[in-house]
């Protein structure tokens, strides 16, 4: 909720233009169905991961940093959207399980990409990887334990 509200608040105040958000992330924000929004955001994270790989191969550090930030923002939007549904992941697992599987796959791909990097370049993805791991763990915990009442 916090990340989505922050983005929406910054957009409303005009501090961040909608043009500064990646096009796919804007499309995800425009989606009213929160479950679908989380899926679109995770799809965008996958696209950003591919962009990060391409940027690294081209030795384009600014594009790599932007892609890492986009991964982090996309994953946060997905998590915030699922949290905003107010649903218990254990009782209504559809979007939560789908997100858990997708974050697990993204983690594997991100880890593989990070291992392909030279040792000195690896910290670029640390923040995105940590956020992705946290969201995955929270999703898994929600599915296994359910929400506290």
What spans do the regions from the language model cover?
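Bacterial N-terminal signal peptides that target proteins for export
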Residues: 1-9
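Hydrophobic h-region of N-terminal signal peptides that target proteins for export
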Residues: 11-19
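Long, charged/polar, soluble alpha-helical segments
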Residues: 19-149
């Amino acid at each position: 909720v916090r990340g989505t509200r922050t983005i929406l608040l910054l957009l409303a105040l005009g501090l961040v233009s909608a043009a500064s958000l990646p096009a796919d992330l804007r499309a995800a924000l425009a989606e009213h169905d929160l479950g679908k929004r989380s899926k679109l955001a995770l799809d965008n994270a996958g696209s950003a991961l591919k962009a990060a790989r391409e940027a690294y191969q081209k030795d384009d550090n600014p594009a790599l940093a932007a892609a890492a930030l986009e991964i982090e923002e996309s994953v946060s939007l997905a998590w915030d959207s699922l949290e905003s549904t107010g649903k218990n992941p254990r009782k209504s697992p559809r979007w939560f399980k789908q997100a858990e599987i997708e974050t697990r796959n993204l983690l594997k791909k991100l880890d593989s990409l990070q291992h392909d990097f030279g040792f000195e370049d690896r910290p670029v993805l640390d923040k995105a990887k940590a956020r992705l791991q946290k969201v995955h763990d929270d999703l898994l915990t929600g599915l296994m334990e359910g929400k506290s009442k």
